[in-house]
Amino acid sequence: MTTPARSRGRCVTLLAPLLFALATAAEAQWVATGALATVPVIRDCTETGGDVAVSRLDPPTVYLCPHVVALVRKKDPGAEHFYFVHEFGHIALNTADEAAADCWAARELAQARNGSRYLAAAIAHFRHRPADSSPRYGTPNQRAERIQTCAEDAAR
């Protein structure tokens, strides 16, 4: 026999994940819209090769590595969201150019409600990284400066 207390317990158990998902979605600052909203996001660390996220242009797809996302979030909460938006920049611009995707993501976040939180986290994240240079990204400090400049330009 099911008692009212047991029924309420089951209801809470079933509704809790849904309420958590809705609360998480409400906190998200940037959401893909238009054609970008149809881009699949797949959680697959094999596809990311150990990176936070990567994108493919044909077909347009974003891959996330939940393990690396969690590591970035633990160290620099919010910076992981910049990586996510950055990958959509590649798809929106149909380019492999990392600087262009950085700038696109910075402009998008600068216009998003409370996007400055994610921008500040990403800028701090890159400023704290070792000064190793990459031909695709430049140094982490150059990347931080690029993100900041693009965000400031978008805010004008």
PLM features: what roles do these ranges have?
Residues 29-75, 103-156:
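C-terminal capping/extension segments of zinc metalloprotease domains
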Residues 13-23:
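Bacterial N-terminal signal peptides
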Residues 29, 95-98:
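Conserved strand-to-helix beginnings and helix N-cap segments that scaffold or border functional pockets
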Residues 71-74, 91-95:
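Extracytoplasmic/secreted cell-surface and envelope-processing proteins
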Residues 78:
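Positively charged, aromatic-enriched nucleic acid-contacting surfaces
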Residues 82-94, 101-102:
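Active-site recognition of the HExxH zinc-binding catalytic motif
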Residues 3-15:
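Bacterial N-terminal signal peptides that target proteins for export
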